[in-house]
């Protein structure tokens, strides 16, 4: 995500292409399951927080790197994995995390979710008012260091 943002800022097309290719051919196919979940994250001690972080980072990649010719928001792997599917999977558990089907995070469970960037980016990309509405309701200025550390974009509206 950081490489993509710096590459775009500096106009480094080679690195932007590298990041886009890595998203399509490494990150999305290897980190997302067919249902849109992130199995590597759901096996960790903080599966909820890390799943959110992973989706935030991927959504930010889509936001930073998408062009008319290469729209990562619309990209889908041959086996159906996409950022849209990832958002659709996690969204219900942002709305009501008591329905989270995996173990609770061992720490900071009560601090999540906050105003996650994937919600506002996804709302814009997919014209989904529900994503924006829930984003507006969530905490926009978290105070817990662990939450701040795992919130890759704190002001998504400027992106």
Regions found by a protein language model. Name each.
Residues 1-13, 55-71, 115-130:
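Well-ordered alpha-helical scaffold segments within catalytic/enzyme domains
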Residues 51-55, 62, 83, 87:
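Aromatic-rich carbohydrate-recognition surfaces in CAZymes
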Residues 42-48, 69-76:
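Active-site rim elements
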Residues 4, 17-20, 59-62, 87-91:
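Non-transmembrane alpha-helical segments in soluble domains
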Residues 72-159:
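CBM-like carbohydrate-recognition segments
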Residues 1-52:
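Active-site cradle of extracellular carbohydrate-active enzymes
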Residues 42, 54-57, 76-79:
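Solvent-exposed, flexible loop/coil residues
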Residues 8, 24, 28, 63-70, ...:
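Sec-exported extracytoplasmic/periplasmic mature domains
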């Amino acid at each position: 995500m950081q490489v993509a943002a710096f590459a775009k800022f500096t106009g480094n097309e080679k690195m932007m292409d590298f990041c886009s290719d890595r998203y399509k051919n490494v990150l999305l196919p290897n980190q997302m399951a067919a249902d849109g979940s992130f199995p590597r994250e759901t096996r960790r001690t903080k599966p909820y927080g890390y799943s959110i972080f992973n989706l935030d980072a991927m959504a930010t990649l889509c936001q930073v790197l998408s062009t008319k010719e290469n729209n990562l928001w619309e990209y889908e792997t041959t086996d159906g994995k996409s950022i849209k599917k990832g958002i659709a999977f996690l969204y219900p558990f942002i709305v009501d995390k008591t329905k989270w089907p995996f173990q609770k995070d061992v720490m900071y469970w009560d601090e999540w979710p906050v105003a996650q960037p994937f919600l506002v980016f996804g709302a814009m990309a997919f014209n989904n008012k529900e994503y924006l509405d829930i984003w507006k309701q969530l905490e926009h200025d978290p105070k817990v260091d662990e939450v701040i550390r795992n919130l890759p974009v704190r002001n998504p509206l400027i992106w």
